[in-house]
C-alpha cells in the first residue's frame, strides 16, 4: 500500500488587493489550496476577510506578519521612513545588528494579531511573515514569546523555510535563494521545537517570479522528493495597477493562478500520490 503524502499549499498575501483576494477565494472554493495567510496591514484586508469565515473548517487561515513596505498599524519609528515601513534589505541589516526597538516590534505584531482576530473572530491557525520577516534575528524570538503569551496551550503553528540542502539541489530551482531561505529558517524551526510549537516539515515554492518560466514545470520541481507535511508557498493573483505599485511579483501571480486552477495541476497531484 502506498501512503498518500500530506502537502500544504499556502496562498500568501490575502488582503493585498481586492483582485488577489478574489483569486484566492476562487482557489479555496475549487479546493486547490490548503491554507491562506492574511496581510492584515493592507487596506484591502478587513472587509474581504469576512468572506473567509465560511471556509473556516475547510482550510487553514493564518496571518502574514508584515514589517516591510506598507504603512504600519502603530508608530514604529525604528523601522519606518516618512511613515512607511522600510524595505526588506534594510530590515535584514537592522535585524542582523539588532538596530531597532523590540518594544515597537512587539506592539506592532500584537496590533496585527488584534486586527486579524477582530476581522475573523478567531485566532490565526498559523503564523508566517511577508518576506519571511518572522524568521529574522530577534524578531523570531519576539514572535515565539508573543505566541506563548497570547495563545497558551493552543499555539498556532509557525512556518519555517528550512529545507534539506540535497533536496534543494535535486529540485534545481533558484538554488542560491532557496539555500539562503533554508538557512534563514533554521533558528525559527529550532525555537518552535524547543517551545512545543508545530511547524512544517520541508519547504519549497521559491523562484525568481519570472514570467518567462513555465510555472507548471516549476511546481513539478517544488514537489520533487517531499516529506509528509511539506509546505509550498504560492502567490496567485490578478495583476492591476494597484498590485503593480506595491508588489515586485505582480506579473507572475497570473501565471500561478492559471496553473493552480487548471486540470494539469490536479493531475500532477494525483500522479505524485498527493
Tell where the protein language model's regions lie, with residue ranges.
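Short histidine/acidic/glycine/proline-rich micro-motifs that form metal-
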Residues: 131-134
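Terminal accessory/targeting
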Residues: 1-8, 18-59, 66-126, 136-274
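DG-centered beta-turn motif at the end of beta-strands
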Residues: 11-15
